[in-house]
From Swiss-Prot:
Transmembrane segments: 21-36, 101-115, 140-156, 203-218, 237-252, 457-472
Keywords for the protein's UniProt record, in alphabetical order: Chlorophyll, Chloroplast, Chromophore, Membrane, Photosynthesis, Photosystem II, Plastid, Thylakoid, Transmembrane, Transmembrane helix
Function summary: One of the components of the core complex of photosystem II (PSII). It binds chlorophyll and helps catalyze the primary light-induced photochemical processes of PSII. PSII is a light-driven water:plastoquinone oxidoreductase, using light energy to abstract electrons from H(2)O, generating O(2) and a proton gradient subsequently used for ATP formation.
Organism: Nandina domestica
Protein name as catalogued: Photosystem II CP47 reaction center protein
Superkingdom classification of source: Eukaryota
Gene responsible for this protein: psbB
Membrane topology category: Multi-pass membrane protein
Amino acid sequence: MGLPWYRVHTVVLNDPGRLLAVHIMHTALVSGWAGSMALYELAVFDPSDPVLDPMWRQGMFVIPFMTRLGITNSWGGWSITGGTVTNPGIWSYEGVAGAHIVFSGLCFLAAIWHWVYWDLEIFRDERTGKPSLDLPKIFGIHLFLSGLACFGFGAFHVTGLYGPGIWVSDPYGLTGKVQSVSPAWGVEGFDPFVPGGIASHHIAAGTLGILAGLFHLSVRPPQRLYKGLRMGNIETVLSSSIAAVFFAAFVVAGTMWYGSATTPIELFGPTRYQWDQGYFQQEIYRRVGAGLAENQSLAEAWSKIPEKLAFYDYIGNNPAKGGLFRAGSMDNGDGIAVGWLGHPIFRDKEGRELFVRRMPTFFETFPVVLVDGDGIVRADVPFRRAESKYSVEQVGVTVEFYGGELNGVSYSDPATVKKYARRAQLGEIFELDRATLKSDGVFRSSPRGWFTFGHASFALLFFFGHIWHGARTLFRDVFAGIDPDLDAQVEFGAFQKLGDPTTKRQVV
């Protein structure tokens, strides 16, 4: 059978046993990849600094997903939140990876068994003796089972009733930990940033799935609906399954890119909108303002800013700064963050505090402009010295650091002031180690960016797949050239004009 590559799946079209076999093999591949990828990531992951070198800076992709479901400890004796553990238990990172690999092996064997023993009695219609599947019944079974799993996840795993809970954090990603979550049954449950909505929605959706599954098991579809939606055709199953998958992919691409309770910034990195809106900058200034109101000095107020919060307020952690095809982790780009140098405060010779305009997300270069509290430009680094009026030298700008490693250090020589003004464009200033990984200094995206790009791309592809297979199953008779009027159209002498039903001859 000389099939072209895009038609090879027709070999399982009317073969339920081997259709099942290839799906089990696919599950084996997916599970095997997940387990192997987890082991690879654990081999290269450095857990020593959860603040300045978290999993998302290191380009971890599957570790964040395990962590958000409640896995925090490793058989290597470390915890994702820092510190050591003595008894991580079976459900550690390695335990989950191993379970996936064992499951993959079992699926592999099951796939081979079903490929060899494809002609089972269960796949044959007892009335006709031909291979056939009761698709509406199978739909009911799957809906019931997935509803049961969905309900169980929401009612037991997330709530901590029988399970660890999920990763929950504060709005600024500072205090995250795995904890049990109570379902949010009020209107707050519809807020995508409220973790309680995850529990309540899984319980509600699971209940609906169980009831819908029982309905489809006990009620047969009407004949007209069965025929109209081609419920006896396996390609209908393919089309509607693709629809479910692409819809889910679009949804998770959105929750990942825009942020939600399911995609904590401690695990996947901040979103681009948090940089665009100055989200962390506002919180830092609020905390400093609160400290000053309590009669703390500027240095004391800035010293109390958590390094973790300052690190979020750095453009290198913005997932939209990495080029789409720049491979590698964020650490391979601007380097491994070593420490916060402190917050630079610039002043002109008249004592006015100046603020460096920050680089917008989609700029690679941006002019260095310093404005006062009213937004009036007071200093810059000019492109042409001959025409400059606001140069650092002319205005006499100085810089002093508060908090961090350079706390209390000030500079007045123009070259150093300009250096730190350029770096202040990129948010808070950090010392970055580019030697260890031979980092090239070009920003990379975080797993948040990769996940979004991948899922949005595949969702679009699967959308077209749904249209394609839906059209094929709905119009199969047309595409195959099978038409109820076909006999009459080609019968010699049926029409005065060949194939024209308006000129049908009268039977004498």
